[in-house]
């Protein structure tokens, strides 16, 4: 029985074709019920990681920690649990794993005692020099208990000989490279750090006189906090006694946030550059519509990721927008008696065709991205089986040809369909009548730029261009995902 359940869970995960953001972070300082506020913030960030969650709190004398498998709402919904997390200061973390064993010790936040006092660390992102740093630390006598690069950061902080914790943090971040957002808790401060290019997001909020740090603004909304600003690229914010100090230790660089925050990662109601992610995605759909070259009867999104782009597409062209695919939002948490028939259903466990809506229709099917193409193939077949006359696939971003090194769960280049096939070959593989990706310039225009600056790109867009703002130090080749994710904040293995 256990074997069958494991097979089913693996199949469910494999039929999620999206790139996966790896973790959400949250922190609050000097606030009543800090652990409860942190649990609410993590709940709002649940889309950034569903496999584990943790909170560390501080009451002025002691630190308290709770780490659990699964969703925030299933673990931090009881008063008894939250009462164990005493104090007016807390940080939290949602975990998304990629590979490796699933153990409680790998769930964040991590905690360590240093000669300047205790420190808790929650990390979203990935270090591109994590293996090199880890090997050097081990040579110097460090003992590691996990395979997470977050522990590497903790070890670097603990190893620093500087007397103040904030100086130890500065020492550590000078040694790390990659895309990262850190939220840390010490005996008298809340600290936020964002990488020099601002690849991973981190925002500042205010709840009365208390400060809040979070991966997205939606986590501020749920607790009634007001958005103040983004943590700037390369900035360290030190929050003590309800006062915020900005520290900028790095040479100035042009900010390059991850393009997939706009396309998919951020929750639709989160604010990115003064617009919600939903508005950005509608604008992406409008640009996709401007590049349209086929006629059809209806526009159908792949739910939920394609909804906003499909709506913008349909509104611009004055076409009918229809929910031709219905998503089962509960499949990942439902116990299903395993059988060969169930295991063979695959994508139907998550999606089903709305037959009367699509029968005898020429359909424009819109999704946010195409990675391996396996699910697109099954969805197109599902629509044809339900009676669709034609299925034209539109993708709301350019072709994904390159893997990620900054904390996103991507396949190797060998597994990325667009890296190995032409547009016509991909179209044939997924079984569509036609296939079109949004142009790179169209994507930049949708997000608010006149065009891409090829000398200093405004976004981290290496998925499409191979232009990495931070070059990987650790040479991993085609084994990149297997090796690097073992040391990533997402896997925490």
Where are these regions (language model features)?
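PRPP-dependent phosphoribosyltransferase catalytic core
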Residues: 173, 188-189, 224-230, 381-493
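Phosphate/diphosphate-binding loops
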Residues: 171, 219, 226-227, 231-235, ...
């Amino acid at each position: 029985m256990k074997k069958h359940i494991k097979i089913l869970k693996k199949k469910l995960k494999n039929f999620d074709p999206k790139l996966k953001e790896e973790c959400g972070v949250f922190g609050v300082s000097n606030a009543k019920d800090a652990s409860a506020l942190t649990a609410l913030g993590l709940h709002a960030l649940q889309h950034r990681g569903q496999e584990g969650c943790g909170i560390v709190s501080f009451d002025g004398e002691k630190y308290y920690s709770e780490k659990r498998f699964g969703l925030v709402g299933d673990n931090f919904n009881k008063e008894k649990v939250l009462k164990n997390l005493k104090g007016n200061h807390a940080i939290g973390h949602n975990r998304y794993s990629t590979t490796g064993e699933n153990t409680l010790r790998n769930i964040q936040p991590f905690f360590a005692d240093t000669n300047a006092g205790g420190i808790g660390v929650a990390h979203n992102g990935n270090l591109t020099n994590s293996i090199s740093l880890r090997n050097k630390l081990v040579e110097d006598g460090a003992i590691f208990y996990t395979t997470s690069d977050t522990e590497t950061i903790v070890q670097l902080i603990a190893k620093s000989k500087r007397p103040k914790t904030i100086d130890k943090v500065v020492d550590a971040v000078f040694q790390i490279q990659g895309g990262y957002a850190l939220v840390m808790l010490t005996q008298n401060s809340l600290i936020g750090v964002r990488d020099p290019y601002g690849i991973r997001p981190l925002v500042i909020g205010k709840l009365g006189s208390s400060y809040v740090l979070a991966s997205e603004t939606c986590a501020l909304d749920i607790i009634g906090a007001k958005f103040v600003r983004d943590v700037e690229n390369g900035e360290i914010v030190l929050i003590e006694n309800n006062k915020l100090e900005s520290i900028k230790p790095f040479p100035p660089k042009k900010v390059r946030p991850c393009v997939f925050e706009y396309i998919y990662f951020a929750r639709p109601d989160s604010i990115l550059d003064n617009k919600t992610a939903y508005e950005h995605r509608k604008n992406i759909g409008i640009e996709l519509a401007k590049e349209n070259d086929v006629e059809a009867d209806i526009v159908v999104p792949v739910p939920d990721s394609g909804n906003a782009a499909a709506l913008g597409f349909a509104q611009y062209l004055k076409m009918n927008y229809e929910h031709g695919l219905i998503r089962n939002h509960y499949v990942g948490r439902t116990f299903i008696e395993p059988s060969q028939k169930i295991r063979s259903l695959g994508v139907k466990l998550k999606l089903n065709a709305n037959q009367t809506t699509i029968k005898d229709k020429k359909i424009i099917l819109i999704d946010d991205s195409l990675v391996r193409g396996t699910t697109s193939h099954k969805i197109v077949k599902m629509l044809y089986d339900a009676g669709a006359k034609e299925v034209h696939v539109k993708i709301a971003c350019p072709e994904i040809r390159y893997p990620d090194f900054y904390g996103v769960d991507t396949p190797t280049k060998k597994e990325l369909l667009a890296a190995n096939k032409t547009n016509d070959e991909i179209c044939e593989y997924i079984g569509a009548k036609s296939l079109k990706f949004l142009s790179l310039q169209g994507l930049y225009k949708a997000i608010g730029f006149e065009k891409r600056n090829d000398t200093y790109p405004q976004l981290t867009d290496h998925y499409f261009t191979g232009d990495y703002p931070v070059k990987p130090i650790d040479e991993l080749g085609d084994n990149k995902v297997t090796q690097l994710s073992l040391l990533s904040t997402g896997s925490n293995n």
